[in-house]
Amino acid sequence: MILPDWAGYRRFRPQLAEAMDPAFYPIDHLDALILSGRARLWVGEHAAIVAEIRDYPGGARAVHGLVAAGRIEEINAQLIPLAEAWGRALGCTHAIIESRSGWMRALKPYGYAPHRVALRKELRP
């Protein structure tokens, strides 16, 4: 198991928490994923990303971007390629990022294209 850069994580933890929807993914959940080794953290000078490996019933294996914070240029040019290389080394055939719609535009030059659309409705009593 690779030990996480906990000091780097703590530096970006507030921004990562802000980027996540706490109703679905509270920051404590991300803490647990990183500490357990189920998710991997990459920290740069001005940005950080977290990803995990997901295996799908049809046999596909993907490196799945969970959350990112900081300067988008550093995320796109430096950190995402590190996560992709990690995924390739672990047998991943895909990289998937499920996030806000602005990421579609930001990641298009890096070969990312829309895959699915998630629709959400709040169910009230």
What are these regions (language model features)?
Residues 60-108:
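Acyl-donor binding region in acyl/amide transferases
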Residues 20-40:
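Active-site rim helix/loop that mediates acceptor-substrate recognition in acyltransferases
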